[in-house]
C-alpha cells in the first residue's frame, strides 16, 4: 500500500475488475482525499460511488481588514522600529552644540549598524526557537528604555560629564539598535505571512518615522528657543509615539485577520491549513474485500502488535460506511535544529531570492555612505545648522514618497532591480562635490544638496522596498518568515558596509565648521537665516 504518511496521491488500481471503468481498489494519503473529493464533485463522480468528504473549517471566509486598520497598524509598526534611532540622529544641532568638533553622528551611525548586524544575525538563528511575538515585545522594551533614560538623565537632569554623556549616548544607541533590529527583522517575517501590501505598509512606516521625527524637530526648534527644552520635548514626543506603536501591536496581534494568516503556515506543517489539531491519515478502500482501512502514522508499533490493533487504524465492513477521524497530535518537545539544517534552510531560500538580497544590500549601502553622516555635516554660511536639518527632512519625506510608490503593481525581475540599485552610486560623487574642497565646495549653493537628497530619498524608498515585498512571494508560505529574516540580513549587511565607508568622508568635512565666520549668529533664528 506504500509508506504511511507519504504526500502523493496514488493511482487507482483497476486490475482484475469485471469492468475497466469501475475502480475496485484505491488509496488516498493524508488530507488529499478531501482535495480529490472536492474536484470530483464538479465532474459528477459522486454518482459513480467516489466518496466525498467536506470540512467546515476549510470553508472559513478570509477576514476583511475593515477600515484598513491592520494596514495602519503595520505602518505604525514600521514607525516603531526606526523612530528611536531617528530620534538620536535628527537632533543634529543639539549634538553639534554639546559635542563640538567630534564625529558624534558618524559614531552613532556606525555603533547602530554594527550592533544591528549582530542582532539580525542572532535573530535569524533564533527564528525557529523563540516565538515571533516574544522577539517583537523584547525589541519594543529595549527601544523604549534608552529613549526614556537619555531624555530624563542626560537631556533634562544632565547627570553626566561631557565624556560620560558621549559614551552613554553611544551605549544607548547600541541598546536601541539591538532591540529595534530584532523587532524589525521579526516584523518582516511577520508581514511575510500576510498579503504583500502589509510588507509595503511596514516599509512605508519606516519612512513615516523619519518624516515625523524631522517635523517634530523642526517644530520644537521653532517653538522653543531654548535648545535644551526643545530637545527634551522632542525626546518625550518620541517616547510617546513609540509607546503608542507598542500598545497597538499588542492589540492587533490578537485580531482575527492576523491570526487567520499567521496560523496557516504553522498548520501547513501538519497537512492542510485549518486542520491544526489533526495529524493526517490514510484511507484504503478495497471494494472486492469490502474493507475500508483508515491508518494514521502513529509511533512505531511493538513487534508483536498488528497494525489493525493500533488506535490509529479503523476498518468498516461491507456496509460501506465511511469513517473519518483525526488522531491527536503527539506532544513533541521543541529542540534546537542542527547547524547543518539551519544552513540548508537558508541556502534553499537564498537560491530563490538572491537577486532581491543583493538589490536591497546595494541600495542601503549607497544610502548609508551619505546619510546621515555626510548630509549632517553640510554647512552654509547663512543657513548654518538649519541646512542639515532641512536636508535630512527632505530625504525622509522623499523616502516616504518612494515607499508609497513601491505599492504600484510593477512586475520587476530580480536582475533588473539589482541593476537599478547599482545606478544609484552616482549620488556619492555628487554629494562629495557639495562639501569638497573644504570651505569652498564645487556645489556650494544649498539647493544642490536638497535636490540630491530628494532624488536619493525617492530612489532609496522605492528600491529599498520592492525587493523586500517581492521576496516573500517567491517562496512557500512556511518559508516566508525565514525569507523576511534573510532579506533583513542582506539589508543590514548593506547598512554596515555603507556606515564603514561613510567614515572615509568625514575627513572631507573636518574643516567645514570654521569656514563661515558668521554661522553662529545665523543659528539662532530661521527668520534671520532666510
UniProtKB/Swiss-Prot annotation:
Any single GO CC term annotated in Swiss-Prot or TrEMBL for this entry: apical plasma membrane
Post-translationally, this protein is described as follows, namely: N-glycosylated.
Membrane topology type, per the record?
Answer: Multi-pass membrane protein
Q: Which organism is it from?
A: Homo sapiens (Human)
Q: Which InterPro entries match?
A: Eqnu_transpt, MFS_trans_sf
Q: Which gene encodes it?
A: SLC29A4
Notes on how activity is controlled: Activated at acidic pH.
Q: Where are the transmembrane segments?
A: 69-89, 102-122, 140-160, 167-187, 232-252, 352-372, 382-402, 417-437, 451-471, 487-509
Is Zinc-finger there in the keyword field? no
User: Can you quote the domain comment?
Assistant: Glu-206 is essential for cation selectivity and may function as the charge sensor for cationic substrates.
Q: Can you name this protein? A: Equilibrative nucleoside transporter 4
Outcome of substituting residue 206 to A = Loss of dopamine, serotonin and MPP(+) uptake; gain of uridine transport activity
- Per the record, what are the reactions this protein catalyses? serotonin(out) = serotonin(in); dopamine(out) = dopamine(in); (R)-noradrenaline(out) = (R)-noradrenaline(in); (R)-adrenaline(out) = (R)-adrenaline(in)
Which residues does the annotation flag as glycosylated?
523
The protein's UniProt keywords, in alphabetical order, are: Cell membrane, Glycoprotein, Membrane, Transmembrane, Transmembrane helix, Transport
Tissue specificity, per the record, is: Mainly expressed in brain and skeletal muscle. In brain, expressed in cerebellum, cerebral cortex, medulla oblongata, occipital pole, frontal and temporal lobes putamen, spinal cord, substancia nigra, hippocampus, caudate nucleus, nucleus accumbens, pons and choroid plexus. Expressed in heart, in both cardiomyocytes and vascular endothelial cells. Also expressed in adrenal gland, small intestine, pancreas, kidney, liver, bone marrow, lymph node.
Q: Which GO terms describe its molecular function?
A: efflux transmembrane transporter activity; monoamine transmembrane transporter activity; monoatomic cation transmembrane transporter activity; neurotransmitter transmembrane transporter activity; nucleoside transmembrane transporter activity; organic acid transmembrane transporter activity; organic cation transmembrane transporter activity; toxin transmembrane transporter activity
Q: What does this protein do?
A: Electrogenic voltage-dependent transporter that mediates the transport of a variety of endogenous bioactive amines, cationic xenobiotics and drugs. Utilizes the physiologic inside-negative membrane potential as a driving force to facilitate cellular uptake of organic cations. Functions as a Na(+)- and Cl(-)-independent bidirectional transporter. Substrate transport is pH-dependent and enhanced under acidic condition, which is most likely the result of allosteric changes in the transporter structure.
Question: What additional remark is attached to this entry?
Answer: Does not interact with nucleosides, nucleobases or nucleotides, other than a moderate activity for adenosine. Mediates the uptake of neurotoxin 1-methyl-4-phenylpyridinium (MPP(+)).
User: Which effect does the record note for changing residue 206 to R?
Assistant: Loss of dopamine, serotonin and MPP(+) uptake; no uridine uptake activity
Amino acid at each position: 500500500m506504500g509508506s504511511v504518511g507519504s504526500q502523493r496521491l496514488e493511482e487507482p488500481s483497476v486490475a482484475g475488475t469485471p469492468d475497466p471503468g469501475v475502480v475496485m481498489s484505491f488509496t488516498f494519503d493524508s488530507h488529499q482525499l478531501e482535495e480529490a473529493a472536492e474536484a470530483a464533485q464538479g465532474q459528477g463522480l459522486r454518482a459513480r460511488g467516489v466518496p466525498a468528504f467536506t470540512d467546515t473549517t476549510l470553508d472559513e471566509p478570509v477576514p476583511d481588514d475593515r477600515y484598513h486598520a491592520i494596514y495602519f497598524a503595520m505602518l505604525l509598526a514600521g514607525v516603531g522600529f526606526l523612530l528611536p534611532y531617528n530620534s538620536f540622529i535628527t537632533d543634529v544641532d543639539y549634538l553639534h552644540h554639546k559635542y563640538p568638533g567630534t564625529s558624534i553622528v558618524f559614531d552613532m551611525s556606525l555603533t547602530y549598524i554594527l550592533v544591528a548586524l549582530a542582532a539580525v544575525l542572532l535573530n535569524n538563528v533564533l527564528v525557529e526557537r523563540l516565538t515571533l511575538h516574544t522577539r517583537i515585545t523584547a525589541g519594543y522594551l529595549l527601544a523604549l528604555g534608552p529613549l526614556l533614560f537619555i531624555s530624563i538623565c542626560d537631556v533634562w537632569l544632565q547627570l553626566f560629564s561631557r565624556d560620560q554623556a558621549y559614551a552613554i549616548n553611544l551605549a544607548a544607541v547600541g541598546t536601541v539598535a539591538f532591540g529595534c533590529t530584532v523587532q524589525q527583522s521579526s516584523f518582516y517575517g511577520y508581514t511575510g505571512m500576510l498579503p504583500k501590501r502589509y510588507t509595503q505598509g511596514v516599509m512605508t512606516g519606516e519612512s513615516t518615522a523619519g518624516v515625523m521625527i524631522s517635523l517634530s524637530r523642526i517644530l520644537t526648534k521653532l517653538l522653543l528657543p531654548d535648545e535644551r527644552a526643545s530637545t527634551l520635548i522632542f525626546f518625550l514626543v518620541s517616547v510617546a509615539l513609540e509607546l503608542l506603536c507598542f500598545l497597538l501591536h499588542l492589540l492587533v496581534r490578537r485580531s482575527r485577520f492576523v491570526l487567520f494568516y499567521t496560523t496557516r503556515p504553522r498548520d501547513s506543517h501538519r497537512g492542510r491549513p485549518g486542520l491544526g489539531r489533526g495529524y493526517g491519515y490514510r484511507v484504503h478502500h478495497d471494494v472486492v474485500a469490502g474493507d475500508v482501512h483508515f491508518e494514521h502514522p502513529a509511533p512505531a508499533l511493538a513487534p508483536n502488535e498488528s497494525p489493525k490493533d493500533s488506535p490509529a487504524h479503523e476498518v468498516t465492513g461491507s456496509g460501506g460506511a465511511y469513517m473519518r477521524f483525526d488522531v491527536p497530535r503527539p506532544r513533541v518537545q521543541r529542540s534546537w535544529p542542527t547547524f547543518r539544517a539551519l544552513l540548508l534552510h537558508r541556502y534553499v531560500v537564498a537560491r530563490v531570492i538572491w537577486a532581491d538580497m543583493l538589490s536591497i544590500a546595494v541600495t542601503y549601502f549607497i544610502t548609508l555612505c551619505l546619510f546621515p553622516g555626510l548630509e549632517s555635516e553640510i554647512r552654509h554660511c547663512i543657513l548654518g545648522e538649519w541646512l542639515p536639518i532641512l536636508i535630512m527632512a527632505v530625504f525622509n519625506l522623499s523616502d516616504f514618497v518612494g515607499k508609497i510608490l513601491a505599492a504600484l503593481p510593477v512586475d520587476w525581475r530580480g536582475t533588473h532591480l539589482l541593476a537599478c540599485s547599482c545606478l544609484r552610486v552616482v549620488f556619492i560623487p555628487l554629494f562629495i562635490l557639495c562639501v569638497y574642497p573644504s570651505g569652498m565646495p564645487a556645489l556650494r549653493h544649498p539647493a544642490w544638496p536638497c535636490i540630491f537628497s530628494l532624488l536619493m530619498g525617492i530612489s532609496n524608498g522605492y528600491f529599498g522596498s520592492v525587493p523586500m515585498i517581492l521576496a516573500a512571494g517567491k517562496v512557500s508560505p512556511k518559508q516566508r518568515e525565514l525569507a523576511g529574516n534573510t532579506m533583513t540580513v542582506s539589508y543590514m549587511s548593506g547598512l554596515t558596509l555603507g556606515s564603514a565607508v561613510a567614515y572615509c568622508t568625514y575627513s572631507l568635512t573636518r574643516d567645514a565648521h570654521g569656514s563661515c565666520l558668521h554661522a553662529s549668529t545665523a543659528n539662532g533664528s530661521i527668520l534671520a537665516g532666510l
